[in-house]
From Swiss-Prot:
GO terms for biological process: positive regulation of DNA-templated transcription; rhamnose metabolic process. The keyword Cell membrane does not apply. It holds the Pfam family HTH_18. Keywords: Activator, Cytoplasm, DNA-binding, Repeat, Rhamnose metabolism, Transcription, Transcription regulation. The keyword Transcription regulation applies. Binds DNA as a dimer. GO terms for molecular function: DNA-binding transcription factor activity; sequence-specific DNA binding. Its main location: cytoplasm. It comes from Escherichia coli (strain SMS-3-5 / SECEC). One of its GO terms (cellular component) is cytoplasm. This is HTH-type transcriptional activator RhaS. The gene is rhaS. It is found in: Cytoplasm. It comes from the Bacteria.
């Protein structure tokens, strides 16, 4: 597995923060780093396989990657990321207690993926741009300024994540997308789902298309197919069982959609013919 080293990304040995844009981010094999990072998805779509679990990522997704996590990107479509790198929560010169603002693992579950709305993403970009402007300066005031900006970024993300802000339709759409990650195999009635998240059906269609480039049903089908592909690679269940477990009532229809999406049949994936990035 590829290991990325801080010496290749941080501008100096005492720099606590570095900015690494990926515009765009191509498919990239599984790797880990000797530093931490906050991955901010600017726009586009892709699959982020994080510690073996696939997540659909779109504009507004924020992922917190620790130095022992392994991850990869695949099936990317104009996926543009900004990575905010930091050595460790306890390796800042002027900041302490940052762990309290970061996601915490509870009962073996690590809430690695958050979502923010478009207006918050604009504020995030401004903070990151300010950090980039000062990246070449190594004096104490510049170091302190970068670390303060990093703290502001963490505060903004925490306050604005879907877990704490459901006041507008964009935030409710983010919550809906997170709900679909957990309920992709359910029979989805879009009228009922729109009501559940206090959105009109028209608003749901318009905003989801703006954010993902897909209609709601197309997005759900892709999500189901991504989950199915993961199971084909990492479980012994039959193709038919996987189709049913991922929300498809007809395995033949599932196979047709699968081949259309990935240009490989489920059997091809099961046998590793697609040359899956390891």
């Amino acid at each position: 597995m590829t290991v990325l080293h801080s010496v290749d990304f941080f501008p100096s040995g005492n720099a606590s923060v570095a900015i690494e844009p990926r515009l765009p981010q191509a498919d990239f094999p599984e790797h880990h780093h000797d530093f931490h990072e906050i991955v901010i998805v600017e726009h586009g779509t892709g699959i982020h396989v994080f510690n073996g679990q696939p997540y659909t990522i779109t504009g507004g997704t924020v992922c917190f990657v620790r130095d022992h996590d392994r991850h990869l990107y695949e099936h990317t479509d104009n996926l543009c990321l900004t990575n905010v790198l930091y050595r460790s929560p306890d390796r800042f010169q002027f900041l302490a207690g940052l762990n309290q603002l970061l996601p915490q693992e509870q009962d073996g579950q690590y809430p690695s993926h958050w979502r923010v709305n478009h207006s918050v993403l604009q504020q995030v970009r401004q903070l990151v741009a300010q950090m980039e402007q000062q990246e070449e300066e190594n004096d104490l005031p510049s170091t302190a300024s970068r670390e303060i900006l990093f703290m502001q970024l963490l505060l903004l993300l925490r306050k604005s994540s879907l877990q704490e802000n459901l006041e507008n339709s964009a935030s409710r759409l983010n919550l809906l997308l997170a709900w679909l990650e957990d309920h992709f195999a359910d029979e989805v009635n879009w009228d009922a789902v729109a009501d559940q998240f206090s959105l009109s059906l028209r608003t749901l269609h318009r905003q989801l298309k703006q954010q993902t480039g897909l209609t709601p049903q197309r997005y759900l089908n892709r999500l189901r197919l991504m989950k199915a592909r993961h199971l084909l690679r990492h479980s012994e269940a039959s193709v038919t069982d996987i189709a049913y477990r991922c929300g498809f009532s007809d395995s033949n229809h599932f196979s047709t959609l699968f081949r259309r999406e990935f240009n490989w049949s489920p059997r091809d994936i099961r046998q590793g013919r697609d040359g899956f990035l390891q």
